[in-house]
Structure formats: C-alpha cells, structure tokens
C-alpha cells in the first residue's frame, strides 16, 4: 500500500498525523555525587540503587572513620535509599592510581638448549640451570645469555604490570596471546585467576576468577567458559569467543586476545597452566593501588562529569566534600542544570566556627542549600559512633517529597525539611555540642539550615533556605525546586517545537506549557495569587511571543504554594 500521492490512478493511505505530544513521565529523584572508595571504576558515573547490594558491590564498604573521604559512601547510602538512583563518580589520584594486568606468554617448551637448533620467538630452553625465552628467530650458535638480543630471561608464563586509569591495555604482537585486567577499579591484590577444564575436543577452557574476604576465605567471583574462534558458540548457542564472553558476561574483567592464535599453539600452554587438585595453580595480580589522596584537579575532573546534560540528574549533594573550589564548581553545575545542590558545613565545627566557615566560603546561588548538623550517630558499617554530614540525607528528604504523587504529578513543591520528610535515618543520634544555643535569626541571615533534635528522638532539618541573600521568594528551597521542574519540562516542550513552522510552533508551546502548569495546579504546587489586585486570580499566565522570524519567547508567570516555615499562636484572654 502506497503512502505517497503520485499521478498514478491508485488509492493512497498517508502516514498518520500525531500531534499528541507530552512531556515529563521520567524519574524526578536522580541524585549525583562524587566519592572516595576502595574500588569502582574511576571517573565514570555509576548508577547506585538503594536496593540490594548495588553500592557495596560497586564501591566496597564505607571507609574507616578516620580515613580521608570517609563521609562519601555513608552519605551515598542514605541518598540511594530514597532516590530513584544516584549517579556516583569515584575520584582517585590520577597520577598514582594503578590497575593491574596479567599478560600470558605464547611460549613453547623446547627442553635443553642445543647448538645448531632453529629457535623461534617464544621458545623456552634450559641452560646452566637457568631458563631463557627466545626473543628472535635464530639458529643457535652460542649459549643463551641475557643481553645478546636473541634471548631473554624467562621468569614464568605470565607477566604482571600495572597501568594508569586512562591507559588502554592491548595484547600487541610481542609474544603474548592474552592480556587480562580488572575494570571495576579494584586493586585486585587478593584476586587470582585459574585456568580450568581444558577441553581439547571442543577447543575451550574455563577462566575462573577468585577473591578473598577480610577473613582470608577464598570465594569465586566469576567463571567463564571461553573459546578462541570468533564464530565459536557454546552448547546454548551463545557466542563463546573469549573477548565476547568477557564483554557480555563479566562485570569485573576484560581481556584482549591475540587474533590469529591457533588452538594447536595454545593447547600445550593451557595444559601446562591448568589448575588441578594434584597441581593447583593460580595467577595473582600485582601493582594495583588506589594511590594517595586525590588532588584538586582530580576532584574537579570527577565533578565535571555531572555537568553532562546527557546524564539524567535532578539534584546534587556534596557527600562530605568541603573544599571551597569543588563546592563552587558543584554549585556552578547546579545553576547550569537548574537542579538543587545540598552541601554541609563540616559537622565537627562549633556553631561559631560553622558560621565563620560558611561566610568564608562565600557561595551565592538559588540552587545551593547549606546544612549544619553537629551530630554523631551509630555507624552501621564500622561500629561505634561516627560523625558524618547530611547532604545525602537531604537528597533523600527531597526524594521523599517528590514521591508524593497527585495522579502522575510528583510532589516537587514539598519542602525537604521538618519531621515528616527532613529526618535522618540514623540511630543513636547525639549532639556534639549540647551546651551551645543556636541563634535562629543569625542562621537565617547566613541562610544556614540547622539540623535539630526531634522530641521523638533522632534529628531533622528545620529550615529550607538557599544561598540566595535577597529578600525575595528565591531564598526558599521549595520555590526553586518547583521552578526548576517547570524549566526542565519547558526544555522538553521546546525541543518538540524546535524548527516547526510558526503556527505549529505556537500550538505546541502553548498546549504543552498549559498541560505542565495545569498538572501543577492539580497537585497543589501552583495556587491562586495572594495579591489578586496586582496579579489577578489565575494560578498561572502563559505569554508566547514571536520576537523574530526564528526566535520565540515563552513566559510563564506562576504563583507557587507557600510552606509553613513560621507558625505563630496568639493567646487571648476572655472575661
């Protein structure tokens, strides 16, 4: 059936016209942060979910209490429990971090060295109680010796090396048939590799990777049955080629295989390396390290990944970062992306010290919120009491509000403060400075949100102010959250209308903006103006103007709901 009208005498059915565009519908509680961890591929966003063991599998346990960067994973854990997920980047010292590799030699045992014999690269001989491997094709005339150019000292069938985070590992053409390396950022110092179940008929073998826990117990990480033919299939019809198996079945390791290597070349090597009960063999990794403390450039490099608009993100939290330059960059990214940013004044500071610290920081942004939480709490990971900040907990509080749906509309206008949403999910909460009294007026002037004890136990955030110092509505967090939500959906609508002709452009923009704002009226995010004489009695007003032939200007005036920050009771005596 044709779908194009031509001069032919035929019946044509045209493609359907569908102008039923919509925006929204995606997750609205995706967090973002940067952490220090013992493992996890560095400088790459990882999606961390609050269910299962997603965080510990990716990054390991939170660091010891006195370790550099110990707050990060603790705060991430709190955020991930309530957020849809958290885009998390591991930062490392890029000059000192190393990941290990194992390079397997393509060798052939030739026994004792003999004069007049033709030797090929990879041939291994014994002479004078030492082993040598041929480095070049030659006919033996003089006994093997290191430095001759014909022989190298043979140290074993596997060579070990380590590499920088952005260094690629390739098998090359210098005598190796396989290079194996971790991709999960683990230093792999307790990991070993075994070759098992060499099948000479099907021309396959099994690579089994092991690790050890803190008690020294060895357990299996992965077991992969592989072949060396690019078209090889396993018994279930899945690709069995070694590189494909690692890419599709392994989350921790990758390999590079020397193309063109034949089974006849590998079989004696595999049989010599095969792990058996009678002859147990395992190859360990060496040289992997997390390096020292990350430098400021490393932090900025990691944080900058959160700027990418292709990365879904609705909020940022500092996760224990207190460096002014890094906080300033995260604030800049939040302003650029129109999303909230939660950060802590260091919890170990006294009230006066906290005020001075925030003043010296000097941030100014309608998206940044500062919190002061001088509390310790029970540490579920390391035991005892530990002090860590609340930026992750505030991301969780924001997610709790977003999860209050009215039909399909998230509760973006709910403030992440108070006992209902702004509480800390911690036990054994105790104040570090119980004798100090907070001056709430001074806190307001500094736009510093205090975390205070609750009468029912625990603690909660007791204000929702941004680092915006003008006396207008933009100083309130929930106002900006609602504006940002509208901004994000407007961008979706504008993308749909982009490059359409005038009439269709106006229709799409008006229809979609009206849909967005009507939904927010239904949810209670938008309310009738408090000054009807000045602003009228409609919750919103949309104005669309074509400024130039290729430029459209869309304005939405909205009245956003308030929040009961202040409640006054007036006693009155009667006769």
Q: Where are these predicted regions, by residue range?
A:
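Intrinsically disordered, low-complexity acidic/polar segments
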Residues: 143, 216-218, 325, 563-567
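Well-ordered beta-strand positions in beta-sheet-rich domains
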Residues: 45, 124, 131, 566-568
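A glycine- and small-residue-enriched flexible loop/hinge signal that marks low-structured segments
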Residues: 1-109, 157-509, 516-536, 541, ...
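Tryptophan-rich substrate-binding surfaces of secreted polymer-degrading and adhesive proteins
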Residues: 107-157
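Hydrophobic residues embedded in beta-strands of well-ordered beta-sheets
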Residues: 131-132, 205-207, 552
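A generic structural motif
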Residues: 126, 208-212, 559
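Active/binding-pocket-proximal capping segment
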Residues: 510-514, 573-575
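C-terminal edge-of-domain segments
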Residues: 539-575
């Amino acid at each position: 059936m044709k779908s194009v009208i031509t001069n032919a005498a035929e019946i044509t059915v045209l493609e359907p016209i569908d102008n039923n565009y919509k925006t929204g519908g995606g997750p609205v509680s995706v967090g973002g942060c940067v952490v220090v961890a013992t493992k996890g591929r560095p400088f790459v966003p990882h999606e961390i979910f609050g269910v299962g063991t997603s965080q510990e599998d990716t990054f390991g346990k939170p660091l010891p209490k006195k370790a550099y960067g110990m707050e990060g994973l603790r705060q991430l854990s709190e955020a991930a429990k309530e957020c849809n997920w958290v885009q998390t980047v591991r930062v490392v010292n890029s000059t000192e971090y190393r990941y290990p590799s194992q390079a397997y030699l393509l060798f052939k045992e030739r026994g004792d060295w003999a004069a007049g014999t033709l030797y090929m690269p990879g041939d291994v001989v014994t002479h004078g109680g030492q082993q040598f491997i041929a480095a070049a094709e030659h006919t033996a005339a003089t006994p093997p010796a290191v430095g001759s150019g014909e022989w190298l000292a043979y140290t074993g069938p596997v060579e070990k090396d380590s590499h920088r985070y952005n260094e690629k590992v390739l098998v090359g053409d210098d005598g190796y048939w396989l290079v194996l390396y971790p991709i999960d950022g683990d230093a792999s110092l307790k990991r070993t590799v075994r070759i098992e179940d060499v099948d000479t008929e099907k021309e396959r073998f099994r690579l089994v990777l092991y690790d050890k826990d803190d008690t020294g117990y060895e357990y299996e990480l992965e077991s992969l049955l592989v072949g060396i033919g690019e078209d090889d299939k396993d018994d279930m019809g899945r690709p069995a080629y070694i590189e494909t198996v690692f890419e599709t079945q392994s989350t921790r390791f990758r390999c590079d295989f020397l193309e063109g290597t034949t089974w006849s070349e590998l079989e004696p090597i595999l049989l010599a390396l095969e792990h058996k009960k009678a002859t147990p063999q395992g190859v360990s990794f060496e040289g992997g390290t997390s390096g020292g403390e990350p430098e400021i450039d490393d932090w900025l490099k990691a944080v900058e990944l959160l700027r990418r608009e292709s990365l879904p993100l609705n909020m940022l939290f500092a996760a224990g970062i207190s460096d002014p330059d890094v906080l300033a960059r995260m604030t800049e990214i939040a302003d650029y992306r129109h999303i909230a940013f939660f950060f802590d004044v260091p919890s170990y500071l006294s009230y006066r010290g906290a005020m001075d610290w925030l003043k010296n920081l000097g941030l100014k942004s309608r998206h940044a919120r500062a919190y002061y939480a001088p509390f310790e709490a029970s540490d579920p990971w390391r035991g005892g009491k530990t002090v860590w900040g609340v930026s992750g907990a505030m991301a969780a509080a924001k997610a709790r509000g977003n999860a209050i749906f009215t039909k399909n509309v998230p509760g973006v206008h709910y403030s992440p403060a108070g006992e209902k949403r702004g509480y800390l999910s911690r036990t054994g909460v105790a104040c570090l400075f119980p004798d100090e009294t907070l001056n709430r007026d001074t806190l307001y002037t500094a736009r510093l949100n205090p975390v205070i004890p609750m009468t029912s136990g625990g603690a909660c955030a007791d204000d929702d102010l941004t680092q915006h110092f003008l006396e207008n509505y933009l100083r309130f967090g929930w106002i900006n959250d609602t504006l940002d939500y509208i901004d994000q959906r407007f961008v979706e609508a504008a993308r749909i209308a982009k490059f359409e002709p005038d009439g269709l452009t106006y229709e799409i923009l008006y229809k979609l903006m009206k849909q967005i704002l009507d939904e927010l009226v239904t949810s209670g995010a938008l309310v009738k103006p408090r000054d009807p004489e000045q602003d009228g009695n409609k919750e919103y007003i949309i104005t669309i103007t074509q400024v130039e032939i290729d430029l459209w200007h869309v304005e939405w005036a909205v009245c956003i709901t308030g929040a009961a920050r202040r409640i006054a009771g007036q006693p009155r005596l009667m006769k």
